[in-house]
Amino acid sequence: MKIWFPIQIRFRDLDPLSHVNNTVYATYYEEARSAYFAHIPHWPLAGEHATESSEKEEEHTARIQTTVVGRHYGILIKEITCTYHLPLIRTDRVEVGSAVVHVGRTSIVMEHQIRDIQNHERIFSTGRAVAVWCNYRTGRPVPVPSALRAAFEEIEGHAFPLET
């Protein structure tokens, strides 16, 4: 994992058995993705498509609510998976890691891990998220901008060649 983000386990995160509810893990992964993207200068790079994309202008879809002055491009989560290794409880001190492991033509695959903040061998969960770079007005996938691909390559320390 490249970017680590500390998580504060809250009382509201717990189920009746005082474990972190299984659905909360996805929220922890989401917070880690946000922390990861905060390391990218000028995120979300929304203006790049004006010169890079050949997509034609399509009608706005009511499924995605944006304002006229809002961002037109960004990620939508297509898939999230989580494997639970150990239960999390209120007193655990943990951090969530994120790494980009694949960049496709329109998709970005990230892996996540929740671990003990001091004992890094104590892994609570591992997960994966598939995000799609979309035009928010149309709800349709568009190519990942080259500047975003380059930012991922810089953070991760290796290339993500454009698939042909």
Where are these regions (language model features)?
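Catalytic strand-loop segment that frames the active site of acyl-thioester-processing enzymes
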Residues: 1-43
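HotDog/MaoC-like acyl-thioester-processing domains
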Residues: 3, 84-93, 100-164
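Residues that recognize and position ribonucleotide moieties
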Residues: 7, 18, 73-75, 122, ...
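Short aromatic/hydrophobic contact patches that present stacked aromatics
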Residues: 8, 81, 130
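Residue-level signal for pocket-adjacent positions within structured domains
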Residues: 9-15, 70-71, 137-139
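Short loop/turn motifs enriched for small/polar and acidic residues
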Residues: 12, 78, 113-115
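Acidic-residue sensor for enzyme active/binding pockets
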Residues: 30-31, 79, 111, 156
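Hydrophobic beta-strand-centered segment that forms part of the acyl-chain substrate-binding groove
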Residues: 36-109, 124-126
